[in-house]
């Protein structure tokens, strides 16, 4: 019988497009430098040279479909509450049975730490299997001792053979499985090394099949590439149920867990953690943490209140506007949309009369948050105007509102929740859209002065930073 031949192909790790030769740019998705080498088996032709005969449909099958009405949807039975409230929030209330959850993040950000702590919490009442392909069993033990993780119901195995691991899962039937990491796993019947597109794709598919068949929730750790996306084919993110990103500056203790895909919950929720010597600790009051250490009495700072899912979070926005010596001024934004910053600068120039053409502009969101909500437009504009005029925004004043191209301040959703959070934290003045204010009862917020503005110029005058 003829054997399969091996051939080298190049696969785009963004869209999965294949090519017989290397290309600098993927012809399908247009991404640059994403074609990676892979080795696949090419089926050999028969001695007669004929194509394989088509599969004959017999009309017989062993499949037994269920009536949809008979499928159990009881929440208590379909989810596992982890005991880590911030993680449960991001997942939509707990881990769904049989779900496959992919978690990615930069090296050293804390992926293995949070999963080991998760195993410890779940193991209090259930059995857990932790599979490591990167560390030895002894190394995992040392970390578990440092984190003070319960160890009675946690089984650990150092293995990278996917078929062996799947067989072990079928045999043990644990209540939770952790695979750390998918880039170290390999299928022996796939003719390529670990971490290649073919290996990652096939390994993910086999783990998915075992998880769905046995209703065992499975966490898979994925490495990220230089652009911050999870390394490997995009099909891996498509087939899993949930994709989580663990974000944060490694020089700071704060970590943010964010869902970019979630079949069983919202993708707008975030979980916040503090990295300590004893592992990750939950941050139950993120607004207070985000505002800690913000400069007082210095120009260029304005406080915003953003909605992260159902949770309002206060965040300090910093702007630095300085005169440039070069013909092309520099624009930099960290944690805020770069193109949105350009739009707001244009509105400030056209509608408010400020000149930024000879100024470098830098925007930074304190605490490592990424603000993509249009309700941050007004505080960003006020921060830039404050820095340009070198006049500080009052310490206990926050701003909420979307800014249109005409300089108008547009209404935002969930304003009541934002104002309650501002009141709880201790702010005394809130600059809000006038349209929103007309529909609010100011008596609900004693001690918080509400200032309604219809245009950007009114907001600047309201906080008295206009010369």
Regions found by a protein language model. Give the residues of each.
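Peripheral, non-AAA+ core regions of ATP-driven protein-machinery
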Residues: 4-14, 18-89, 96-102, 109-120, ...
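P-loop (Walker A) phosphate-binding loop of NTP-binding proteins
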Residues: 106, 133
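Conserved RecA-like ASCE P-loop NTPase motor core of nucleic-acid helicases/translocases
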Residues: 128-132
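Divalent metal-dependent catalytic cores for phosphoryl transfer on phosphate-bearing substrates
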Residues: 137
């Amino acid at each position: 019988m003829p054997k399969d031949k091996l051939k080298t192909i190049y696969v785009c790790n963004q869209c999965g497009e294949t090519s017989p030769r290397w290309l600098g740019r993927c012809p399908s998705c247009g991404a640059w430098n994403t074609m990676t080498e892979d080795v696949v088996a090419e089926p050999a032709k028969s001695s007669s040279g004929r194509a394989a005969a088509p599969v004959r449909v017999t009309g017989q099958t062993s499949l037994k479909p269920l009536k949809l009405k008979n499928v159990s949807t009881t929440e208590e039975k379909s989810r596992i509450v982890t005991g880590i409230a911030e993680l449960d929030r991001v997942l939509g209330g707990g881990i769904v049975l049989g779900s496959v959850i992919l978690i990615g993040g930069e090296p050293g950000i804390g992926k293995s730490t949070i999963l080991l702590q998760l195993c410890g919490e779940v193991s209090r009442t259930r059995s857990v299997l932790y599979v490591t392909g990167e560390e030895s069993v002894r190394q995992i033990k040392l970390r578990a001792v440092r984190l003070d993780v319960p160890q009675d119901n946690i089984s650990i195995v150092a293995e990278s053979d996917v078929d062996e691991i799947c067989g072990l899962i079928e045999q043990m039937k644990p209540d939770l499985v952790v695979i750390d990491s998918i880039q170290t796993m390999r299928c022996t019947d796939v003719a390529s090394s670990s971490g290649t597109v073919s290996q990652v794709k096939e390994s993910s598919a086999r783990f998915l099949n075992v998880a769905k068949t046995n209703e065992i929730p499975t966490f898979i750790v994925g490495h990220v590439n230089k652009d911050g996306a999870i390394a490997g084919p995009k099909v891996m993110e498509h087939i899993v149920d949930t994709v989580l990103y663990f974000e944060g500056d490694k020089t700071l203790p704060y970590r943010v867990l964010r869902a970019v895909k979630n079949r069983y919950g919202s993708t707008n929720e975030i979980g916040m953690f503090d990295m300590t010597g004893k592992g990750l600790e939950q941050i139950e009051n993120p607004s207070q943490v985000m505002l800690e250490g913000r400069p007082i009495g210095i120009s260029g700072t304005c406080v915003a209140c953003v909605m992260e899912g159902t949770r309002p979070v206060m965040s300090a926005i910093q702007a630095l506007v300085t005169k440039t010596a070069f013909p092309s001024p520099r624009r930099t934004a960290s944690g805020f949309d770069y193109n949105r910053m350009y739009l707001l600068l244009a509105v400030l120039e056209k509608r408010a009369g400020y000149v930024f053409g000879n100024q470098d502009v830098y925007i930074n969101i304190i605490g490592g948050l990424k603000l993509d909500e249009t309700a941050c437009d007004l505080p960003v504009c006020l921060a830039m105007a404050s820095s340009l005029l070198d006049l500080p925004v009052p310490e206990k004043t926050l701003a909420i509102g979307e800014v249109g191209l005409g300089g108008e301040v547009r209404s935002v959703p969930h304003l009541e929740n934002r104002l309650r959070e501002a009141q709880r934290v201790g702010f005394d003045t809130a600059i809000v859209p006038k349209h929103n204010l007309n529909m609010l009862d100011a008596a609900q917020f004693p001690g918080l002065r509400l200032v309604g503005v219809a245009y950007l110029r009114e907001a600047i005058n309201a906080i008295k930073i206009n010369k």
